[in-house]
């Protein structure tokens, strides 16, 4: 029954689709949950789906034409110029790492489309970023000047500062006008100013996003190239292990001076002893063995010598003791009988 009722419901109108998609974008940008959370990603996908429907309806209605100026666009239709910018902002919120490069390129196309429209209608004075074709043609000129000059860097920095200040002023004006416009109390001139300020704000946002997108695309490209290089190197056939080699100079030196360390033994100890005994060069060879009589005489001679040395020591000891006694007993010590 409910499905049958849904079939007879009128399709959503363009303003309703636009307001719903803008509300989803505001909720995604102001969400406290992580961007990769399921709740935020569902809002991102739903917002992109609604914006696709809005873009198709705008194309069917042919709401904007290159034959008209900005003043010819009605105040209530100015907000639909921001649809490509909304698409780029929500596309940047997708968090699929494998499709990150595709998302960046899609978001850049949306922002470029928005800036091209604003540049054509002269919503604000700004320099239109290069498209992919222009950047490819000027690649040689860019690489020829590897490092930008200090003047160019200073001008870019000053432009960013000016955009930031302008963005803060626009946000302050929009916050003061928002309640009156959304409640329907503002007049047509006030509504037109409100949407023109929104268009200028999204111009600044789009320029900043394109700069960050170009930097991220460059980083991803360098990462992919380094990965391909590492893969190609790993795919190379492994070289066979190198064989040990000997320098001719070292080999000749080893033949003359040896290997530089003691060689292995060429004979056993028994062979060495037999060889030296044969040539009569052992320490105990050439000394005649003593007879028993000679051994007895040598022993007796040694004993007599030791006895003489012992007697000499006793005589020397007695002489020392006598000298000591004379030192302590002078001549005439103790003889006092004939003295008066």
UniProtKB/Swiss-Prot annotation:
This is Immunoglobulin-binding protein 1 family member C. One of its GO terms (biological process) is regulation of dephosphorylation. Gene3D superfamilies: 6.10.250.1140, TAP42-like family (1.25.40.540). Belongs to the IGBP1/TAP42 family. InterPro entries: TAP42/TAP46-like_sf (IPR038511), TAP46-like (IPR007304). Residues 318-330 have a biased composition (Basic and acidic residues). GO terms for cellular component: cytosol. Residues 303-314 have a biased composition (Acidic residues). Pfam families: TAP42 (PF04177). It comes from the Eukaryota. Residues 223-243, 292-340 are annotated as: Disordered. The gene is IGBP1C. GO terms for molecular function: protein phosphatase 2A binding.
